[in-house]
Every structure is written in C-alpha cells, then in structure tokens.
Amino acid sequence: DVYKRQVNNRSEGLNFRVYNNKDIEFLDVRDQSGMRTYVRSLCFVLFKAVTELFPEGKLFVEHPVSKGYFCNLRIGRPIELEDVKRIKQRMQEIIAENIPYHRIECHTAEAVRIFSERGMNDKVRLLETSGSLYTYYYTLGDTVDYYYGNLLPSTGYLKLFDIVKYYDGLLLRIPSRENPEVLEDVVKQEKMLDVFKEYLNWSYIMGLNNAGDFNLACEEGHATDLINVAEALQEKKIAQIADTIFHRGENGNRVKLVLIAGPSSSGKTTFSKRLSIQLLTNGLKPFPISLDNYFVD
C-alpha cells in the first residue's frame, strides 16, 4: 500500500493535489518517510483511543525501542492487561470506521488557544516558541492533535499494528520495513530502555519535558547551561567506565582490551581519547588504536 508521495523530491501527503506536470514517487512502509507517516497516523489513533477511554490520563510516545515505540501512559495507577485490551479494541474500532484525518491551517495564536482549552500545554509551549505566524493541526473526529509531518488520508489505511504491555508502559508494534505484511519482532533491549529512562529523568530534573521546554530554555539564555550539564554527565559516565575497568584489575580480572563500536562520525575516536584520560587518572596507561586507519586492499 502507498502511504506517501515525493512530488518533485518534496514529501507530500496523499491528499496533495497535482495541477501541473511533476515527478511523483509513491512510497510505502519500506521507505523511511512512508514508515514515519504510517507511525504518526497510528499514534493519533492511539491518542484518540486513550483520550476516550481515560479522559484524565496522559499519553507520552517517548522513544523507539525493541522494534516498536515505547509509550508511557499515566492514569493514576499501574497499567493492567485489561487496560491494554480495551485500548487495542478501541483502536481497531477507530480504524474500522475509516475516519478521515483533517489538516487545518490557521494563525498560530488560534492553534495555541485550541490546545490551551484542551489542557495540552506541551503543544502550547511548542507552538508559542515556534516563531511561525501560521501553523496547522490535525483533527480525527472530535480529537485534536499536532504532528510535524503528513498523515494518511484516513484511519482505514492502517492495516497492521499491535499494542502490548511492556515493562511499566506500552509498546506500539509496527509493520516490518522488509516485509510489510508482518509485524516487527519484539527484541528485548533492557539496557537501551534503561538509557532512555535515565535520559528522561535528567530531562525532567532540568525541566525539559518536550521540545517546547527546550525552545523556551534557549530563548531565556540557558542553552550554555544545558550544554555544560550534558557534557558533565557524559564525563561522569566515562569516569565510571574507567573506574570499572580499574577495579576489575584489582580483583584479578585485568582488562587488556576495550572495543568501541559505532557508525561513521559517531564520536568513537573522541570517546577513546576521553576514556584514555580517565584511565590515566586511575594509574593505567592506555594505548588508543583507531581502526579507521587500517583497510583491506
């Protein structure tokens, strides 16, 4: 199924009207842009279902993990399996009703008023700090939300999904990009989940719960403080790694080799130098070797 179009190399929704000759490429979930459109539309269905079932609840789609998207649902009590079943059933009903997504363009001040009346303060801060005179928002029935990007024409386009209880939250499962007819397998990523939780905790401590909070902090001149805290936390983590390596040697399990892996330009060499400095403070003498300097001819 087609979920998005590239019109003259520009991403457009399926509702975009073409009046002149243009180069058009149709995209499905095997394309990254098409998958993002599918996920955004599915998240709106999830938001609508949660809003109807738990009017006082708060839903946060936080980060991709375990080949899906981890969601934090706050309803004043722990999430139970019955809650997840009700949410999934309501999502299936919304999809079966084939409700259209409507994109509405308006003055930013009007959009701020609409979201403010609904208590969606995160959207209010985001729009107030966007610097745009005009903006847009989406409606799905009587539910309103803001998404940075195109959505599908209607909920009937969403053929495949699942939502399951995952640790203390929910996992929104999506189709596989390699085989859109099946869902992605759930891959346990406990360490990745712990890293994301730590990041969210630090963001909460610093008062940065969303992009709007970050924009406001920058406007108020706190950008340097945010950078310094992030660098200090990174240095603290590297020091903890160096301490772990040192203490293993004290217990007779001397570490002789430390491997640092990552994609191109991800900071591997910089990380190795920072780790070397911390190892030196522990009385160890490291020898960093960058394998980028060695290639097979």
Say what each PLM segment does.
Residues N282-D297:
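Short beta-strand-centered segment that lines the nucleotide-binding/catalytic pocket of NTP-utilizing
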Residues V258-I260:
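Hydrophobic anchor at the beta1->P-loop junction of P-loop NTPases
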Residues K268:
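Conserved lysine of the Walker
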Residues S265:
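Walker A (P-loop) phosphate-binding loop of P-loop NTPases
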Residues F271, L275:
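Hydrophobic positions on the alpha1 helix immediately C-terminal to the Walker A/P-loop
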Residues N8, F16-T37, A49, K58-V65, ...:
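Auxiliary tRNA-acceptor-end handling modules of aminoacyl-tRNA synthetases
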Residues V2-Y3:
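Short, small-residue-biased leader/transition segments that mark boundaries at the very start
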